[in-house]
């Protein structure tokens, strides 16, 4: 015979793919199953399959799931090959081959019960073919192979069980091994205590007591004898004494009956039911027949069959049949139930003795029918729990037909047999369904008997019915209590109170659903012996007259209306047997998802573990199971299975591993299928597993309210999560946006109901009220929304009006205001408007002409002057025409500028002139403030001749009505480098700045060398008004103090700074502090430019003002842009008090707290406030520079890590690279990466990779920034990164190289080039590096190589 598989040598070829091996194994398995194998190469088959199984089994232990299919197919093929060779060529099973097979099958991991069972079946074939050689190999394995010793012992136990089930003596089979076991236990030290216990259990279960005693006495080794002694003592404690063992064995047969007999006296109840049933005909019991040999039993059973072969019952064969039935009863009552129970039941099915019973029981002859029913009774009483479901169903089918027989004695016999059957056999769901189907039968007798059957089931298995079948029991009772037949209703009433006894909640619920007449009938039929605690309600007496009631049309109850059953459609009263597994939706879900309303302890451990038929397998078998899939993986792969498993974990005390990953999987599943969580929402433990806001989102989507969790969480937490949910509903950039679009209506209404329920118990915060106001007009129940708004308004009118007034959307204001005005007549819409009328100032007639062509511009609304302003000198200026005390703050009219600084005029000048106000009280002479803003006093102007187109007041004669009126004593601004972000910007931050009067009119703008203003003499005017103005001007000039300024960083050279620092250090305290050296930043950097600009724009600073600014920001959380620039200036000054305060660790932490506040507010806003974010980044750079110079760093690692996250968040919101925030972030990143300490770099790298993985929407700027950051980190860390880390980085980065976005391609190629250089420096082969970048085309890889060698590769990047 040719071998088409070549001895399966291909399975050992490592170059052969797994798919090809699967094809070979599939073909080979099909060949072995169908045809004979080549005997010449069968040993080679075994060797190759064994080698493959051992190899794949070791891979499975390491968790390689890819080998599972090959392993399963190879194991199945080996088992089929063993059976084929055992049948075809038994002589091939020699000692070496058997040893190879046993070692192979027991060395592989038994992750599945089927693998073990298949192996046992295959080894059984070898045992049947070569029993002596096989037993010898098993003994040798026990002695010399300790790794498989336990599995071999379990195999011997399985073979002993098979011997007993096949009619042979299992104890005789074990006699082949017991002497060898005793010898090994006495001499072999490698036998563990577990194996000794297993040996004892095998012998104790399969052998008689004397044999067990003999083995125990033969063991002389102390450790083994001690184990036997402990096992024997434990058995005696469990069973009481040796004399009681037999009684315990007999009682174990009725264990199923006693396990549910706590509520009822089982024996008394079953006897009572039997006494109430019709009396069974008296049939004499035959003499029992005992057998010592199974062959005689088989011969006698086979001799009974010919009498039942005929299809018809005749005068000749019915007596023979009755005789055979009587003999069969004798056999059943004999010793077969003790000696051959399993074999007898197998013969019952193999010889089809059920056919004989059916022929007898359904006979028209009463005598034969009675003997057949007696046989059924005896069979149930003797074998009871040993009967399997197939025999029980056959008996039920026969007796159900007999019960519907018109002959009364026949159906009574069937009724008594079924009572006996239900009273003895264990619970089966199919048997329950058969009984339940009787209540829908057309036959009245069947429906009548079904009430008794239900009573038996309640008495015996009430716990099982409550936990799994209570829906069907309620329907069963409902139909019986409303049946048209009175006898059926009366019988079912008794059964109802049995159900009420075990499940009062269900019984009370049914009583409330019944009509009054049915309820009264039930209350009048309570069995006294059940001691049911129930008080019947007294119905109210009817006040209707008997005459009136008699004249009304006669009404019948639903169960007794005439011809009711004939008029109702068949579908409404008959239920198909195929529908028995389905109940009403609400009840079935409750029965499966919630614990029943009784105190029964539910044990779910059996459902969480792999069950085995043999208990010794679960206890001793060393299953090297592959780790089961984690719960979060199951939730992702199969959500329904995962949720069911999660429910079992929550119901039991089983600990859930990887709670964070499980939580993440649950949250992802909530977004896709929120309604699948309804069963879990009834479990309190579920709410501890996920964040509260997701729990609150699930409640409305599953028709539940806040009362489900109200008692588990604090009201404060619930309200905070309502705010969070309301904020998320309108977030269009979130990955939950589609989810909220689908369920926004339900979530909004749930939030409104929750707030309304808690309105009286908590004080609503401003944030919550603002969120509610902003929700106006969204997809919601408008009536419910406005009702809630009105209640909040009535609770605190002042607070609500204030918040409504601050709302920016006018339409929202008007909608809510109109609703409130309808309910509250006192409410005025004008109170929420932000445009109050400003009264016109009263101007005297003599001054009216001065204002006709002049526009007064409030100081707070002006912009920084630019080159478009025409400057003029102060020559010819009337000193009485101006007042220096008009400077006021726009936002707070009580706050004055403490300092007005004139920047240096000459670039080479060291000293500058400063004008310091005398005191706030002296300068507070303006009495014309209105509505919180200062109005500039209009001065009377005399007519002067125009010279060269200019007036003597510095104005241009051609200016239109848009002319601004400014103070002529405002300091001069020489530096014209104006911040492009602050000039003429509509941003709110510019409007809030404290402005300085810098619009100075100079006569000759080209005269840069002029240090001080030049005043021209002028004739005095005798006008009294001029005298008054002149006095005011003199007082103001006298209050001016001229002092020198120490200078600034921008006006000093580096040598001057060093010299000055040395001089200051020699004069003052030895410990001096220096400002930030701008050399830390590149000359062309944005940071350097901005700091120089700030240094030139602001003069001297003082510590008091700095402390006030910092404290104000920390306490109030608000600030102005000029305050932020003032803080930056402090880093550049030479004031030792200021520098010492900045270098103090505690104060530096306060400034860092301000920086974190600014960055977090900038990153959390959907639209970035440009000025705030920009200046915050500069301040951060200054703080990092200062912290780097300190001896002990102040900034914590967590602060640096949080800073890096803020940077990523800011960059993620940018739409273009041409943005000052982007450049500032890149420079700050360079500063972070260039620090001497590299301890933060691994954290930065991790955050970059996480941000790349979390990016669902492709942000161009963000991804480019992250790739460039990774490149910088790799360059900075260098050899600190292992090859494995570089490999993972390469795989992650290479995903962006084939992109169509040019920036991504360039950044990824640059980063890959850095990785390439690092690997090349470590002598890594180029081929290996190429394998790390599988997504790169050859041309892309060449680009990476060229970039790594600093060649020009830009032509390839296009």
UniProtKB/Swiss-Prot annotation:
GO terms for biological process: astral microtubule depolymerization; cell division; mitotic spindle assembly. Residues 926-949 have a biased composition (Basic and acidic residues). Residues 915-950, 970-990 are annotated as: Disordered. Pfam families: CLASP_N. Its main location: cytoplasm. Residues 973-990 have a biased composition (Acidic residues). The keyword Lipoprotein does not apply. InterPro entries: ARM-like (IPR011989), ARM-type_fold (IPR016024), CLASP_N_dom (IPR024395). GO terms for cellular component: cytoplasmic microtubule; microtubule organizing center; mitotic spindle midzone; nucleus; spindle microtubule. It is found in: Cytoplasm, Cytoskeleton; Nucleus; Cytoplasm, Cytoskeleton, Spindle. One of its GO terms (molecular function) is microtubule binding. Belongs to the CLASP family. Microtubule binding protein that promotes the stabilization of dynamic microtubules. Required for mitotic spindle formation. Interacts with microtubules. This is Protein STU1.
């Amino acid at each position: 015979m040719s071998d088409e598989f070549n001895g399966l040598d291909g399975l050992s070829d490592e170059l052969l793919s797994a798919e090809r091996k699967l094809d070979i194994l599939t073909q080979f398995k099909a060949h072995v199953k169908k045809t004979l194998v080549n005997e010449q190469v069968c040993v080679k088959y075994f060797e190759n399959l064994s080698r493959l199984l051992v190899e794949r089994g070791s891979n499975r232990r390491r968790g390689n799931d890819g080998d599972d299919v090959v392993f399963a197919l190879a194991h199945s093929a080996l088992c089929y090959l063993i059976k084929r060779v055992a049948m075809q060529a038994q002589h091939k099973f020699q000692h070496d081959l058997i040893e190879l097979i046993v070692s192979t099958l027991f060395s592989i991991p038994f992750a599945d019960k089927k693998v073990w069972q298949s192996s046992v079946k295959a080894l059984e074939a070898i045992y049947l073919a070569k029993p002596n050689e096989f037993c010898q190999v098993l003994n040798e394995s026990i002695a010399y192979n300790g790794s498989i010793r336990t599995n071999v012992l379990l195999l011997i136990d399985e073979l002993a069980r098979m011997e007993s089930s096949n009619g042979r003596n299992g104890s005789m089979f074990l006699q082949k091994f017991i002497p060898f076991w005793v010898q090994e236990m006495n001499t072999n030290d490698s036998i563990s205590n577990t194996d000794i216990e297993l040996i004892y259990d095998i012998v104790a279960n399969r052998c008689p007591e004397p044999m067990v005693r003999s083995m125990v006495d033969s063991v002389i080794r102390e450790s083994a004898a001690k184990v036997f002694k402990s096992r024997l003592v434990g058995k005696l404690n469990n069973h009481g004494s040796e004399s009681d063992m037999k009684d315990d064995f007999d009682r174990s047969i009725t264990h199923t009956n006693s396990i549910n007999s706590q509520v009822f006296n089982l024996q008394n109840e079953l006897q009572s039911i039997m006494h109430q049933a019709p009396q069974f005909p008296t049939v004499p019991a035959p003499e029992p027949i005992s057998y010592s040999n199974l062959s005689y039993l088989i011969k006698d059973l086979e001799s009974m069959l010919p009498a039942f072969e005929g299809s018809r019952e005749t005068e000749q064969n019915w007596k023979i049949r009755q005789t055979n039935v009587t003999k069969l009863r004798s056999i059943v009552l004999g010793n077969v139930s003790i000696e051959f129970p399993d074999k007898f039941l197998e013969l019952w099915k193999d010889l089809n003795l059920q056919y004989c019973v059916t022929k007898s029981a359904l006979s028209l002859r009463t005598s034969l029918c009675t003997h057949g029913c007696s046989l059924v009774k005896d069979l149930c009483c003797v074998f009871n729990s040993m009967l399997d479901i197939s025999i029980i169903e056959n008996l039920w089918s026969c007796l159900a037909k007999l019960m519907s027989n018109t002959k009364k004695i026949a159906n009574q016999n069937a009724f008594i047999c079924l009572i006996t059957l239900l009273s003895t056999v264990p619970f089966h769901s199919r048997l329950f369904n058969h009984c339940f189907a009787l209540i829908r039968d057309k036959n009245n007798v069947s429906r009548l008997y079904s009430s008794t059957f239900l009573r038996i089931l309640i008495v015996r298995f009430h716990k099982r019915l409550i936990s799994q079948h209570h829906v069907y029991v309620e329907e069963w009772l409902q139909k019986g209590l409303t049946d048209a037949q009175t006898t059926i209703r009366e019988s079912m009433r008794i059964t109802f109170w049995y159900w009420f006894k075990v499940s009062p909640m269900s019984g009370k619920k049914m009583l409330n659903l019944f009509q009054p007449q049915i309820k009264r009938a039930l209350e009048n039929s309570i069995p006294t012996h059940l001691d049911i605690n129930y008080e019947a309600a007294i119905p109210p007496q009817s006040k209707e007259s008997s005459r009136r009631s008699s004249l009304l049309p006669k009404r019948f109850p639903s169960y007794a209306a005439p011809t009711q059953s004939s008029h109702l459609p068949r579908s409404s009263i008959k239920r198909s047997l195929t529908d028995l597994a389905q109940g009403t939706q609400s009840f079935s879900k409750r029965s499966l998802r919630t614990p029943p309303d009784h105190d029964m302890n539910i044990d779910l451990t059996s459902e969480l573990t792999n069950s085995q038929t043999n208990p010794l397998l679960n206890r001793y078998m060393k299953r090297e199971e592959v780790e089961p899939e984690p719960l979060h993986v199951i939730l992702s792969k199969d959500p329904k299975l995962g949720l069911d498993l999660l429910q079992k974990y929550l119901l039991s005390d089983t600990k859930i591993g990887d709670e964070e990953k499980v939580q993440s999987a649950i949250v992802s599943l909530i977004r896709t299928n929120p309604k699948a969580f309804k069963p879990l929402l009834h479990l309190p433990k579920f709410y501890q597993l996920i964040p509260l806001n997701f729990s609150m989102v699930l409640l409305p989507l599953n028709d539940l309210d806040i009362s489900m969790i109200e008692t588990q969480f604090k009201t404060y937490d619930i309200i905070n999560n309502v705010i969070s949910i309301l904020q998320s509903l309108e977030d269009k950039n979130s990955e939950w946006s589609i989810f909220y679009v689908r369920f926004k209506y339900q979530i909004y209404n749930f939030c409104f109901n929750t707030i309304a329920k808690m309105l009286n118990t908590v004080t609503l915060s401003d944030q919550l009220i603002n969120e509610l106001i902003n929700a106006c007009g969204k997809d919601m129940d408008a009536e419910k929304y406005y009702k809630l708004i009105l209640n909040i308004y009535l609770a605190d009118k002042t607070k609500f009006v204030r918040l409504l007034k601050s709302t920016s959307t006018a339409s929202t204001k008007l909608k809510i205001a109109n609703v409130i005005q309808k309910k509250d007549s006192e409410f005025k819409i004008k109170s929420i408007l932000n445009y109050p009328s400003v009264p016109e100032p009263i101007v005297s007639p003599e001054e009216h002409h001065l204002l006709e062509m002049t526009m007064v511009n409030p100081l707070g609304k002006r912009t920084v002057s630019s080159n478009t302003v025409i400057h003029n000198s102060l020559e010819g200026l009337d000193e009485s025409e101006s007042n220096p005390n008009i400077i006021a703050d726009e936002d707070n009219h009580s706050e004055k500028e403490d300092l007005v600084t004139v920047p240096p005029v000459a670039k080479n000048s060291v000293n500058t002139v400063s004008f310091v106000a005398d005191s706030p009280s002296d300068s507070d002479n303006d009495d014309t403030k209105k509505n919180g803003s200062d109005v500039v006093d209009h001065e009377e102007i005399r007519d002067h001749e125009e010279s060269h187109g200019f007036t003597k007041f510095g104005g241009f004669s051609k200016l239109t009505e848009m002319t601004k009126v400014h103070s002529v004593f405002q300091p001069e601004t020489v530096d014209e480098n104006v911040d492009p972000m602050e000039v003429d910007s509509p941003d709110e931050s510019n409007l809030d700045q404290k402005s300085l009067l810098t619009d100075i009119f100079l006569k000759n703008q080209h005269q840069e060398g002029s240090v001080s203003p030049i005043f021209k003499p002028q004739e005095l005017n005798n006008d009294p008004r001029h005298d008054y103005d002149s006095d005011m001007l003199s007082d103001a000039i006298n209050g001016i103090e001229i002092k020198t300024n120490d200078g600034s960083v921008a006006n000093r050279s580096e040598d001057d700074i060093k010299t000055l620092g040395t001089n200051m250090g020699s004069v003052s305290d030895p410990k001096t502090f220096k400002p930030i050296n701008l050399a830390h930043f590149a000359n062309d950097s944005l940071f350097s430019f901005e700091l120089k600009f700030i240094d030139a724009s602001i003069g001297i600073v003082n510590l008091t003002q700095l402390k006030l600014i910092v404290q104000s920001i920390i306490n109030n959380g608000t600030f102005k842009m000029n305050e932020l620039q003032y803080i930056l200036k402090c880093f550049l000054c030479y004031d030792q008090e200021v520098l010492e305060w900045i270098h103090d660790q505690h104060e530096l932490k306060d400034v860092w707290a301000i920086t974190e506040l600014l960055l977090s507010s900038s990153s959390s806003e959907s639209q970035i406030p440009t000025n705030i974010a920009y200046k915050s980044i500069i301040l951060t750079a200054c703080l990092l520079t200062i912290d780097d110079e300190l001896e002990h760093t102040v900034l914590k690692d967590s602060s640096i890590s949080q800073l890096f996250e803020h940077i990523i968040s800011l960059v993620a919101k940018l739409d273009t690279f041409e943005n000052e925030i982007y450049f500032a972030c890149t420079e700050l990143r360079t500063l972070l990466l260039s620090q001497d300490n590299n301890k933060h770099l691994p954290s930065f790298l991790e955050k970059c990779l996480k941000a790349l993985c979390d990016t669902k929407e492709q942000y161009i700027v963000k991804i480019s920034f992250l790739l460039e950051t990774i490149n910088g980190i790799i360059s900075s860390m260098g050899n600190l990164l292992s090859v494995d880390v570089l490999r993972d980085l390469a795989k992650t980065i290479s995903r962006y190289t084939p992109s169509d976005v040019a920036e991504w391609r360039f950044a990824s190629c640059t980063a890959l080039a850095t990785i390439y250089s690092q690997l090349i420096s470590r002598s890594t082969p180029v081929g290996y590096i190429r394998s790390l970048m599988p997504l790169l085309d050859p041309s892309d890889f060449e680009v990476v190589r060229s970039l790594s060698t600093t060649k020009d590769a830009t032509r390839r990047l296009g």
